[in-house]
């Protein structure tokens, strides 16, 4: 390994260790006890909830599965990257929400003995677990033929390929049939796509089911699906370009950029209409005083800088202008994708926190804050996602393309 790679891995491992320390402390020392009083300080849904929403709504899997289902040749070139990113982000996202619960081991009692099939949160978790399982199975069929080729090599990568391909179990798993593998992958991809849409929309429905005015909106399921497409297309563009810079340009993968650029542009324009609609409808004082107060916090209050600069300008206006006028330039496309991801992350933070800012009996609102343990784990979780993607990318046969 090159010295830069070693340094990069050491930094990631250090950040993951910091995140582990934060998670360990949160497990034994709750950072914000939930008080059942109107005068309670703090917010029950905090930074890790926002991070969870950000991670699990990176919809690379939906874009890839849709491209595979519709036989879009350009998107099939980046199918492996899309599946890998989705698996990593959903897995780390589920770990994040588990840490936010602080005593997640108690969840087994509720799941096994007191399952509530009418709970929106129950189905949200189930859909994401199912999506993760479908993605792993779809990925296995997509990678299988290339894993069998890689298993013929000597060394650690060959050993890993033998294990993942299940070649060691006998001749049945050692047979190569690329067309059959891709047929299975497409069939499972349909299930993964349906489950992904259900998971994204169900997560939006979870917020809609609350009494909080800024969240209590029937359009949230659709809006969450749109933002998942935004995150997924931006993340794929970002990953493809960074990989091309590090490993050299791959003409097959770069062919996906024009389509992803269009997907990102139209989804950003759709999201801007939703932002305008939600701001007017929810913020109109005659509809809901509490909802109007939350929107005022976004537009003119303590979240105004986040909303106008990070969400609107950095996350929507700047990327749209770049995509419209400089979208064919790869460097500009990289900047647009990065700005979009920053804006989406800011949106998740604002969406979770600002809705919970309400006036108390005293007439004042409680200031938002992030516990140091939460911040430590959030940094560690993002580092863990990057580390897992890097390691899996190095071990798996990413460069071998399949035929459409």
Functional labels for PLM-detected ranges:
Residues 24-35, 67-79, 101-105, 110, ...:
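Juxtamembrane/interface segments at transmembrane-helix termini
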Residues 6, 10-24, 72-74, 112, ...:
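Long, contiguous internal "core" modules enriched in hydrophobic/ aromatic residues
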Residues 61, 88, 95, 102, ...:
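Residues within alpha-helical transmembrane segments of multi-pass membrane proteins, especially transporters
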């Amino acid at each position: 390994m090159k010295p830069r790679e070693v340094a990069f891995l050491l930094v990631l491992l250090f950040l993951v260790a910091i995140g582990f320390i934060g998670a360990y402390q949160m497990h034994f020392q709750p950072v914000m006890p939930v008080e059942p009083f109107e005068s309670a300080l703090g917010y029950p849904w905090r930074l890790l909830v926002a991070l969870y929403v950000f991670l699990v709504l990176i919809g690379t899997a939906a874009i890839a599965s849709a491209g595979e289902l519709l036989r879009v040749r350009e998107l099939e070139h980046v199918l492996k990257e899309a599946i890998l990113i989705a698996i990593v982000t959903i897995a780390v996202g589920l770990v994040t929400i588990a840490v936010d619960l602080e005593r997640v081991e108690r969840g087994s009692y509720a799941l096994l003995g007191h399952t509530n099939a009418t709970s929106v949160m129950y189905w949200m978790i189930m859909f994401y677990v199912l999506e993760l399982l479908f993605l792993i199975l779809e990925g296995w069929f997509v990678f299988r033929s290339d894993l069998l080729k890689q298993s013929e090599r000597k060394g650690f990568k060959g050993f890993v390929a033998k294990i993942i391909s299940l070649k060691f179990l006998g001749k049945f798993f050692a047979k190569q049939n690329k067309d059959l593998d891709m047929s299975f992958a497409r069939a499972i991809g349909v299930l993964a796509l349906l489950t992904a849409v259900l998971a994204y929309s169900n997560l939006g429905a979870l917020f809609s089911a609350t009494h909080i005015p800024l969240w209590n909106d029937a359009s949230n399921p659709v809006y969450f699906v749109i933002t998942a497409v935004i995150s997924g297309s931006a993340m794929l563009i970002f990953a493809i370009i960074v990989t091309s810079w590090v490993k050299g340009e791959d003409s097959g993968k770069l062919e996906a950029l024009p389509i992803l650029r269009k997907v990102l542009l139209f989804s950003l324009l759709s999201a801007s209409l939703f932002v305008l609609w939600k701001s007017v409808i929810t913020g109109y004082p005659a509809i809901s005083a509490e909802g109007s107060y939350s929107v005022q916090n976004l537009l003119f209050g303590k979240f105004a800088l986040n909303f106008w600069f990070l969400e609107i300008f950095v996350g929507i206006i700047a990327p749209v202008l770049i995509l419209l006028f400089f979208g064919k330039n790869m460097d500009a496309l990289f900047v647009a994708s990065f700005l979009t991801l920053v804006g989406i992350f800011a949106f998740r933070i604002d969406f979770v926190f600002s809705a919970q800012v309400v006036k108390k009996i005293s007439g004042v609102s409680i200031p938002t804050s992030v516990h140091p343990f939460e911040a430590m784990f959030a940094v560690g979780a993002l580092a863990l996602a990057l580390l897992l993607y890097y390691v899996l990318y190095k071990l798996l046969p990413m460069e071998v393309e399949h035929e459409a």
